[in-house]
Regions:
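Metal-dependent de-N-acetylase/amidase catalytic core
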Residues: 1-4, 82-251
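Active-site rim/loop-helix segments in enzyme catalytic domains that contact anionic ligands
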Residues: 1-97, 127, 238-244
Length: 251
């Protein structure tokens, strides 16, 4: 199966879904990680072009840890908007990668880029199989709407700090070393997250968030997802089928 993880920035895939991607890759599935932006605002010390170049390399190294491919859709930080051009560009990403299963950002999250990405990806999943919908790149329409899953928001909470309870939790305890390694590849973000987010150690924070999600399902570490099942999106439990019942706790 072909898996596409399309989130806003470099390090988002690793933070929210790195363990799940490691499990899927280990089972032989083809994993592609795409970021909407190269993270060009993620520094107080480098220019936008400098930090973007650094972060593209970091994202590629992180993806390679689990044998995944990486590329950037080349939007810019804090400039992802739900308009016609953006929707067509995201549709082009889906047609280029032809995924069976798509994971994207939570539609409710702390960052405007996360929320806009989530809605654009949802729309692109619908549009990608429509032959009369033009998108750049020249790739053929998809054969069908892919399965769509939303990753958890930051800290697993909504805007009012209430728990955002997922539909299912993936047991990632066996691949926490991979998740740590993937996130550690984003070395440039240690200082940024400390200075801008007040996050002293982003690896420890990731472990705390993963443990918090795991508690929903009595697991040591987990990653939560919501399956988008509105008409006409696929409703069969593909993620559970790919990972196996032992790795999934449905809530």
């Amino acid at each position: 199966m072909r898996i596409l993880h399309l989130h806003a920035h470099p390090d988002d895939a690793e933070l929210f879904s790195g363990g799940t991607l490691a499990l899927l890759a280990a089972k032989g599935h083809h994993v592609t990680i795409v970021t909407m932006t190269p993270g060009d605002c993620g520094s107080h010390h480098h220019s936008p072009d400098e930090i973007a170049a650094i972060r593209r390399l970091e994202a590629a190294r992180a993806a390679a840890i689990v044998g995944a491919e990486y590329f950037c859709a080349e939007f810019r930080d804090l400039a992802i908007f739900e308009d016609d051009g953006a929707r067509r560009r995201v549709t082009a990403v889906l047609r280029r990668t032809q995924p069976d299963l798509v994971i994207t950002a939570s539609p409710i999250d702390y960052h405007c880029d996360h929320e806009a990405t989530s809605r654009l990806v949802r729309d692109a999943c619908f549009a990608a199989p429509a032959p009369n919908y033009d998108a750049p790149g020249g790739d053929p329409p998809m054969k069908a709407i892919p399965h769509l899953y939303f990753a958890d928001p930051a800290e697993g909470t909504d805007r009012d700090s209430r728990p955002a309870v997922p539909h299912l939790v993936v047991d990632i305890a066996s691949v926490m070393d991979k998740k740590r390694a993937m996130l550690s590849a984003h070395e440039s973000q240690r200082l940024w997250l400390k200075e801008h987010h007040g996050m002293d150690n982003f690896i420890e924070t990731m472990e705390e968030w993963s443990a918090k999600v795991g508690k929903f399902a009595s697991l040591a570490f987990g990653e939560g997802f919501r399956h988008y099942r509105m008409h006409p999106y696929p409703v069969s439990p593909l993620l559970e089928e790919l990972l196996g019942a032992a790795a999934i706790r449905r809530l």
